[in-house]
Amino acid sequence: MTDHSPAPAAQDENRLIAERRAKLSKLREAGVAYPNDFVPDAHAADLHRQYGEQDQEALAAAGVQVKVAGRMMLKRVMGKASFATVQDGSGRIQIYLDRGTLGDEAYAAFKQWDIGDIIAIEGSVFKTNKGELSVHAATARLLSKSLRPLPDKFHGVADQELRYRQRYVDLIMTDATRRTFETRSKAVGSIRQVMLDAGFLEVETPMLHPIPGGAAAKPFVTHHNALDMEMFLRIAPELYLKRLIVGGFERVFEINRNFRNEGVSPRHNPEFTMMEFYAAYADYRWLMDFTEHVLRQAAIAATGSAVLTYQDRELDLSRPFDRLTICEAILKYAPAYTQAQLDDAAFVRAELKKLGADVDGPVLARAGLGALQLALFEETAEAQLWNPTYIIDYPVEVSPLARASDTRPGITERFELFMTGREIANGFSELNDPEDQAERFRAQVEAKDAGDEEAMYFDADYIRALEYGMPPTGGCGIGIDRLVMLLTNSPSIRDVILFPHLRRED
């Protein structure tokens, strides 16, 4: 016979929840259980900053009165007096409560409160004999009853999924998690300000697309009932942003979400944040210089330095980023190869097969030399690109939206930026020849028909926009989540997304 009774830990939690619900019932009977008439006038961090260095006598003489509120994280009842620690959005402050000041009824009520409850305190700022800044409570109120007990310990691999699934608990319990998302906000704020200072206009483009475009990726598909048409969550905003360049906005950018119905890994989440920007009369060389500036300023704003530490290794964004062609990178990081070998498509295909690549699959079966070289780069060199490195001169066949080189047949004016072995940004001089773009779209459709799920669709309206004339333009996309991973020393993309996607909970 199978025993479906709860585990001991679950039984304890259920008992505690039942006890707290009983307390809530008494609060309801007594009046308003969740009052909303208290407004704090001070935060913990501000109190520490303003009064942390003052001594007992100075604070006593000043008679500073404050109103604070937050979650009770610690509670020590010692007869007629008690201490509690309240955590607000800025930090923690100790509260001293005594029966003589509060009165018998209020003090008895406080003793019934639980860790996790949201409480409000009015009182005076003072220092204990041990020198800890505190608030001596003149009044204490319960604002919000916590029905679930907070975990005693909230760290380690065993709790990792719980952190992602119940981020609200993680944020309550883990200072480092809160700092991660504060750092993220600083980085995004810096990027936005740098773009505005450079004369870019921030815009919003559609999230629902009639045709997915702007990247090689598998989209999420949905249906618009009123219009009775299939639609796609956007995989990239690129084609809409370039329509705006056609329309006369010479510098535009967007910070928003993209969606790709692909795998989940420490570097991939189906929903992720990108910053894409486009500048008329700019080429890929200007883009590389400007992207360096954007990332360097984001690092300084978020961490105070352009020299980072990631996974115990230095990552220096203060120096000019390296620039290598695909073949130069292979020869540098896999020096057993020669340029002659890399120029031999049959040799490269054979090497890829040795390395386990699916050379007969829909992507590589039809690949030319450039695409094969790129695949070999991904197998041999990409993971070794620790310091910021631009890989340049991508082949036309894997760059359907990039401008072709005027001097090197088959090569585009495109780059990808790598740090710590990960792609951080992708940019290029934009293809603004409508006839060339139409031909490349047709080649993408053929690839899709041959089984390449990530190949692009033919976007006739985008071709029509180009036919009105788009000025010479450069554009780039920066992966915000991966950048924040570096800025916060986070090993997984889930660590820097507030609510990452997970399998359904059992």
UniProtKB/Swiss-Prot annotation:
Binding-site positions, Mg(2+) 2: 423
Cofactor binding: number and manner: Binds 3 Mg(2+) ions per subunit.
GO molecular function, one term: tRNA binding
UniProt xrefs under InterPro entries: Aa-tRNA-synt_II, aa-tRNA-synth_II, aa-tRNA-synth_II/BPL/LPL, Lys-tRNA-ligase_II, Lys-tRNA-ligase_II_N, Lys-tRNA-synth_II_C, NA-bd_OB-fold, NA-bd_OB_tRNA
Positions that bind Mg(2+) 1: 416, 423
Keywords, sorted A to Z: Aminoacyl-tRNA synthetase, ATP-binding, Cytoplasm, Ligase, Magnesium, Metal-binding, Nucleotide-binding, Protein biosynthesis
GO cellular component, one term: cytosol
CDD domains found in the cross-reference section: LysRS_core, LysRS_N
Cofactor(s) recorded in Swiss-Prot or TrEMBL: Mg(2+)
Example GO biological process: lysyl-tRNA aminoacylation
EC number of the protein: 6.1.1.6
Source organism superkingdom: Bacteria
Chemical reaction(s) catalysed: tRNA(Lys) + L-lysine + ATP = L-lysyl-tRNA(Lys) + AMP + diphosphate
Cellular location(s): Cytoplasm
Alphabetized PANTHER family for the sequence: LYSINE--TRNA LIGASE, CHLOROPLASTIC_MITOCHONDRIAL, LYSYL-TRNA SYNTHETASE
Family: Belongs to the class-II aminoacyl-tRNA synthetase family.
Subunit structure: Homodimer.
Listed name of the protein: Lysine--tRNA ligase
